[in-house]
Amino acid sequence: MRKAKIISLIFSIFFILGLCAYYFYPSTTVSTDRAKATREEQIEDGDIIFQTSLSAQSEAIQQATNSKYSHCGIIYKNNGRFYVYEAAETVKLTPLDEWVAKGKDGHYVIKRLRIANQILTFNTLKKMKEEGSKFLGKSYDSAFDWSDEKIYSSELVWKIYKRGAEVEVGKLQYLRDFDLTGEEVEQKLKERYGDKIPKDEIVISPASIFNSSMLETVISHTL
């Protein structure tokens, strides 16, 4: 009799746990899937996405540009799936969810040209991707040189829009225009240039693109 009661108790516990899993976990999954579906309904080919990178130089970029965003890329849709064309270790296509997961706290902002429906036609997007493909596989440019030999994230975005759509998203600046006095900034500059800092080098920052009046916010997501 006692053995039967124990078996009955164990069965009851598993039954209750099963009900909890049924009622709570599926709803979480459904909620996540629904949020993802809603996000993808809002995204369009050619949108620009921003995040706070977790890279070693992220804090220096934030200090120098007085912005929380240190990394960006262009969203492409291929075979029904969304990717981010980015300059990270190399220039590559990264699945959107994977790209988002690499940023701080899962936060990201997606922006779009205010007149995207007039400018980003099928042929223009095609040309942008053709121009972008010329950078595929190139190494990340940690020295922020304006040549095409290596390339950094905001430079990739700016050049694709300029050469593919004849649009300048963000104002070009010189390295000397930034705040170079922060501790992290000074350390990175010393590592890369020694005492010969190229202050007259042309630079485009994620902040400059983010703040462009030509763009409007489509999504601002925080976990």
Task: Specify the residue positions occupied by each region the protein language model found.
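Cysteine-nucleophile amide-bond enzymes
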Residues: 2-223
